[in-house]
Amino acid sequence: MSDFVTFVSLGPGDAELISLKALKALQQADIILCPSTVSPVGNMLSRSRDILLELNIDDSVISLFDVPMSKDRSQAILCYKEVAELIEKHYEKRLKIVVVAEGDAGFYSSTHYISDNLISKNIPTERIAGIPAFIACAALANIHIAKQEEELHIIPGIISSNDLTKRIAIRNSIVIMKPSQSEQAIKQVMSSIDKVEIHYFENVGIKEKEFYTQDIHEIIDRKFPYFSLLIITKE
């Protein structure tokens, strides 16, 4: 048994980008709790589980928990509380428990709700680092996000056109993690700014769905999906 519940970061989606330490923790786990969602037609979807299976993790140790996808986070928060209660039962049985998260489990990851609940129960946790999506995106585009003394501003997703314009004017690099949450505001700014490079990504790490472009017109014409990301840098 491990004295800790381990939060394992899976990286952006490409199974080959997971760390050796993370892989070892997965291979030694008695149970792996893995987030999933339900599609509009009722199918259970889990990108995390897909990564685990690609890593040859035994499906029998994977336990899915459904995360409601809604702007009303009350149901999702309740779900995370229930997951923490389930983990508590496994912990009492002295099992090696892993909770997985895409990207890095400490960077805009909802797993912090689970971790906070476990800490309140005096159950110790540890976290294994992973590659966040924006780092993988920069590698795909072969760009440097920030150089020397440049600052980097990371926006979770919601931003107004005025605020985005002001941030661009400061001439710092900007990462917008979930541009679908402010799609119209972002497109309004994109159509009027200059002297910047705009890099747009979808589904980075998922080879058959991966998309990248710098074409402003193409970006504006696209509907931003949930798994999209923007990097804006000065020329």
Where are these predicted regions, by residue range?
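Class I S-adenosyl-L-methionine
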Residues: M1-A15, L20-L23, Q27-I123, S228-L229, ...
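Class I SAM-dependent methyltransferase SAM-binding "motif I" and its flanking Rossmann-like core
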Residues: A105-R167, D221
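A contiguous loop/helix-start segment that scaffolds small-molecule binding in enzyme catalytic cores
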Residues: V5, I168-E235
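Short gly/pro/ser/thr-enriched loop/turn and capping motifs at secondary-structure boundaries
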Residues: S39-G42, P132-I135, E183, I206-E208
